[in-house]
């Protein structure tokens, strides 16, 4: 077992591994311990993942190192964990986009110092003008006096 495979197993509960194994085995028709790359998309969709054709091609290219056209169960686990992490990252970015829209009171695509102060006041948090200025300075990477969505994402990376 490679380090990647051991890491993938440590990320998953025994229940998840058993669920993945059951799905994997359904497509391992001959019981040989591997599935064809063509069947991979079907298995992933059964397990609640939604890879695009491009993502599947990239995943398969990474996983099927020997070019055999088949993927064994350990390689499959590594791939599923990668996909789960990607999905989680996408969801958290969607949630942050929703927060940004809420904070951007005037819907101009930016959060300014006044909007930032309002956020804290609404949450009952007492924040001084200096603290607001400091937060703006830290978040406003291009020094235009306001925080755009990309700057907001970078700011929030440090919080999570």
Swiss-Prot record:
Named from the GO MF annotations, one term is: calcium ion binding
Expression by tissue? Fast skeletal muscle.
Q: Which residues bind Ca(2+) 2?
A: 64, 66, 68, 70, 75
Q: Where is the EF-hand domain?
A: 15-50, 51-86, 91-126, 127-160
GO CC term (a single one): troponin complex
Mark the residues carrying the PTM N-acetylthreonine.
2
Annotated InterPro entries: CALM/Myosin/TropC-like, EF-hand-dom_pair, EF_Hand_1_Ca_BS, EF_hand_dom
Positions annotated to bind Ca(2+) 4: 140, 142, 144, 146, 151
Q: Per its UniProt entry, which superkingdom is the organism in? A: Eukaryota
Pfam families given for it?
EF-hand_7
Q: Which residues bind Ca(2+) 1?
A: 28, 30, 34, 39
Q: Which SMART domains match?
A: EFh
Positions with a binding annotation for Ca(2+) 3:
104, 106, 108, 110, 115
- Keywords in UniProt for this one? Acetylation, Calcium, Metal-binding, Muscle protein, Repeat
Q: Which GO terms describe its biological process?
A: regulation of muscle contraction; skeletal muscle contraction
Q: Which family does it belong to?
A: Belongs to the troponin C family.
Instruction: Give the protein's function.
Output: Troponin is the central regulatory protein of striated muscle contraction. Tn consists of three components: Tn-I which is the inhibitor of actomyosin ATPase, Tn-T which contains the binding site for tropomyosin and Tn-C. The binding of calcium to Tn-C abolishes the inhibitory action of Tn on actin filaments.
Tell me what else is known. Answer: Skeletal muscle troponin C binds four calcium ions.
This chain belongs to which protein, by name? Troponin C, skeletal muscle
Source organism: Mus musculus
The encoding gene: Tnnc2
